[in-house]
Amino acid sequence: MNNDINSSVESLNSACNMQSDTDTVPLLENGQSASNQPSASSSRGQPQASPRQKMQRSQPVHIQPLRRLQEEDQQLRTSSLPAIPNPFPELAGGAPGSPPSVAPSSLPPPPSQPPAKHFPPGFQLAKLTRPGLWTKTTARFSKRQPKNQCQTDTANAVSRIPTSQMEKLRLRKDVKVFSEDGTSKVVEILTDMTARDLCQLLVYKSHCVDDNSWTLVEHHPQLGLERCLEDHEIVVQVESTMPSESKFLFRKNYAKYEFFKNPVNFFPDQMVTWCQQSNGGQAQLLQNFLNSSSCPEIQGFLQVKEVGRKSWKKLYVCLRRSGLYYSTKGTSKEPRHLQLLADLEESSIFYLIAGKKQYNAPNEHGMCIKPNKAKIEMKELRLLCAEDEQIRTCWMTAFRLLKYGMLLYQNYRIPQQRKGLAPPFNAPMRSVSENSLVAMDFSGQIGRVIDNPAEAQSAALEEGHAWRKRSTRMNILSSQSPLHPSTLNSVIHRTQHWFHGRISREESHRIIKQQGLVDGLFLLRDSQSNPKAFVLTLCHQQKIRNFQILPCEDDGQTFFTLDDGNTKFSDLIQLVDFYQLNKGVLPCKLKHHCIRVAL
């Protein structure tokens, strides 16, 4: 009996050991055993055993939940994470001593989205050796998702912008602009910016006063040519037709729209021929020039440089909307006698800077019609020369009017319309024109207007003497001795824009011509003949005149005068202020001063 019991116990123990060995088979890479695992129900169906047998049978109970967690973990890993390329291909090669890695075939196929970023070093090992890190890693990727989503939304929003607007945002260009003193500034502009907009930008950057007289000048030093850009011209387009040595200048030009202010004073009757009867009025003259249906003609004699030669020939030329013609037979304007000299459509008219020296011109009142392209030959230039400055101004103005027409008048009207649309509080509190200034007598209890010109002149002289007395009292109070006045009055004028220092007469005339031959344009400079004196250079009726300002002494004080001591001023600032309000001995009042701005 005992032998039978012992044999049955040994057979039971061997069966349990075989069951335990089967449950502890090593796991493969996918977490499955090498042989089929018996179910839990079949295990529980065995008869009751001893406590030792229960302890041995309890071991597989903990293996199944762990295996189930690994299977769930594997499903979570393959479903929640995106397809990420393996950053450690050497680990997947089965090198000895290296931990196992996930096979690429076990991952889902890559989606159509852009590939995700690689894991940082060490991440592949952490996900295999420490499965509990999966939740934190997945959460970390879920936190990064809004950032990627935001970038995607931004890219989609940018892609919805029209192509024309995208090109406008991308097309920017740097333009270098020079001032009269040689300084320069590089400005980044849009490709569709006009000359007026660029001038306003430069006025803002250089802290100047925007009086709508600033212009952009196209300057060609090698050709000796320059012209003012029209306000509507595109700067980048003009720059594309300029050679590399050419440049833009930032300058004043008070005469740009002088024709619209005084059109009757521009063209003599013998220069203009109308296709219809004109009464000669100012409004009719403007309408005939600006109306595209009208056909005005500007004719007269000009010196024309012969092509391929240094000689000039006097020809009778005629300017029409279709171009510039010259007559082969005297002053005849018959079609068979007219030959085309230059086209207006694809050309621009320039001033000759030094035509007499560079092109052997008869005088310094030259013009040039240049094609609008970067590379040109000398034979393509049409060099012209007028008799005087007034005739040259008429031809230059006629060329602009016939080429641009109403567009030129709109450029003139835009600043005035902006002033009318400006809010009342932005306008100056006091705006007085020169025509509204009258002489007043305040000697009595009630002020009265002085109508007699002789009495008005005497009142102006008395005002000048009153200024002299006030300045004398100020000098006495500010100086220790009346015999040694303060040196401030002798140098304070150097801080003003209208004072140009030690320049020659020719240089002062050149500056006046560049900034427009309008009445009242002036500048002050040091005298070359008298070291203690100054010179007032003034433009009147398109002619430049010079007036010497001499120092004089009175009661031990030094004064400055223009009229041999009749009107004296303690400094040049007072002198300029006085003649801006009073004509005195000058042909006209001082209206505009020549200025040079450093960019």
UniProtKB/Swiss-Prot annotation:
Subcellular location: Cytoplasm
Pfam families for this protein: BPS, PH, RA_2, SH2
Record-linked SUPFAM superfamilies: PH domain-like, SH2 domain, Ubiquitin-like
CDD domains referenced in this protein's UniProt entry, alphabetically: PH_APBB1IP, RA_GRB10, SH2_Grb10
GO molecular function, one term: signaling receptor complex adaptor activity
Keywords on record: Cytoplasm, Phosphoprotein, SH2 domain
Residue ranges of the region described as Disordered: 1-122
Low complexity: compositionally biased ranges: 32-43
InterPro entries per record: BPS-dom, GRB/APBB1IP, Grb10_SH2, PH-like_dom_sf, PH_APBB1IP, PH_domain, RA_dom, SH2
Protein modification: Phosphorylated on serine residues upon EGF, FGF and PDGF stimulation.
Record text on activity regulation: Phosphorylation by mTORC1 stabilizes and activates GRB10 constituting a feedback pathway by which mTORC1 inhibits INSR-dependent signaling.
Any single GO CC term annotated in Swiss-Prot or TrEMBL for this entry: protein-containing complex
Start-end of Pro residues biased regions: 97-118
Keyword field contains Phosphoprotein: yes
Domain annotation SH2: ranges: 498-594
Primary location group: cytoplasm
Domain Ras-associating: 171-255
Entry's family note: Belongs to the GRB7/10/14 family.
Subunit structure: Interacts with ligand-activated tyrosine kinase receptors, including FGFR1, INSR, IGF1R, MET and PDGFRB in a phosphotyrosine-dependent manner through the SH2 domain. Poorly binds to the EGFR. Directly interacts with MAP3K14/NIK and is recruited to the EGFR-ERBB2 complex. Interacts with GIGYF1/PERQ1 and GIGYF2/TNRC15. When unphosphorylated, interacts with AKT1 and when phosphorylated with YWHAE/14-3-3 epsilon. Interacts with NEDD4. Interacts with LRP6, thus interfering with the binding of AXIN1 to LRP6.
Purpose of the protein: Adapter protein which modulates coupling of a number of cell surface receptor kinases with specific signaling pathways. Binds to, and suppress signals from, activated receptors tyrosine kinases, including the insulin (INSR) and insulin-like growth factor (IGF1R) receptors. The inhibitory effect can be achieved by 2 mechanisms: interference with the signaling pathway and increased receptor degradation. Delays and reduces AKT1 phosphorylation in response to insulin stimulation.
Protein name: Growth factor receptor-bound protein 10
Upper lineage: Eukaryota, Metazoa, Chordata, Craniata, Vertebrata
